[in-house]
């Protein structure tokens, strides 16, 4: 079954082939501050480029994903990309 490609890690087949996704490896290798900075940096990247690409909706989804993961990591919750999908009610304005 082919999933709808919303641009997030939850449905990217190339990530599912590995035992761990890159985000999980980084979580284990980085300090908490480094990891939070990585998540925040990716949020900013996708927010800034979304209006200049053909895949605006995908970049918006990716930005939401990184913002949501940021809130989890800040609470010391281990991110499992397939499990931790962004809830529809998640609000990330003023997050940082």
Which functions belong to the PLM regions below?
Residues 1-96:
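Intrinsically disordered, low-complexity regulatory regions
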